[in-house]
Regions:
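Beta-lactam-recognizing serine transpeptidase/beta-lactamase-like catalytic domain environment
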Residues: 1-141, 175-184
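Short, charged, low-complexity patches
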Residues: 31, 141-154
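Short amphipathic alpha-helical signal-transduction/dimerization elements
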Residues: 39, 86, 150-161
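Charged/polar, solvent-exposed surface patches and flexible loops
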Residues: 76-80, 84, 151, 155, ...
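Gram-negative outer-membrane assembly/targeting C-terminal domains
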Residues: 157-184
Length: 184
């Protein structure tokens, strides 16, 4: 950041960066791992593709818990806020009956249409999944990222979609997303 701002950080720079604007760069995998860290109240496991290799030991780098320097009690506050976002905030479309989903929307500004972003995890107190969804050029995080993330979490956690969710999934499959165009 010092290179980008030539050492001239100010209050506006800090505010802008704190909401993810400016030079904040993170991949969807990094955002999902952040969600996993919040879900686990302060630890994550290094993302990896291979779960096991027959008759082989996986390097402990990929199986051990890596703890942050932030106390678990602080993550609880963040998780509660993310739960409230699903109950009564911008993540309401992430509600899945019988599952306590926690989430956070995002809208990544772009030269064209904004990108719809969602980060979430579930269940709140015994997390099984953390997810990040980016849908380019479609607008607010609540428009696409949240409902698509909820569908993916429901499928993963329940092994299937409810009839209502199946209809929603079909509707999103039929929508035209105008990548790279000024029209929606």
């Amino acid at each position: 950041y010092d290179k980008a701002y030539r050492g001239s950080w100010n209050g506006l720079t800090v505010i802008s960066i704190s909401i993810g604007q400016g030079e904040v760069n993170a991949t969807p995998l990094q955002i999902a791992n952040l969600g996993a860290t919040i879900a686990n109240r302060g630890y994550f496991i290094t993302p990896h593709v291979v779960k096991q290799i027959q008759d082989e030991q996986i390097d402990t780098l990929y199986t051990r818990r890596r703890y942050t320097m932030v106390e678990a009690r602080h993550y609880e506050t963040v998780a509660q806020g993310m739960r409230r976002a699903v109950l009564a905030g911008t993540c309401r479309k992430a509600n899945i009956p019988g599952i306590e989903v926690c989430g956070k929307t995002g809208t990544a500004q772009n030269r064209g249409h904004d990108h719809s972003v969602f980060m979430g995890f579930a269940p709140m107190n015994e997390p099984k999944i953390a997810i990040a969804v980016y849908v380019e050029n479609v607008g607010w995080g609540a428009d696409y990222g949240v409902p698509l993330g909820a569908l993916m979490m429901e499928q993963y956690l329940n092994g299937k979609l409810s009839p209502e969710s199946e209809k929603l999934a079909e509707m999103y499959q039929q929508r035209h997303i105008g990548y790279g165009t000024a029209d929606r």
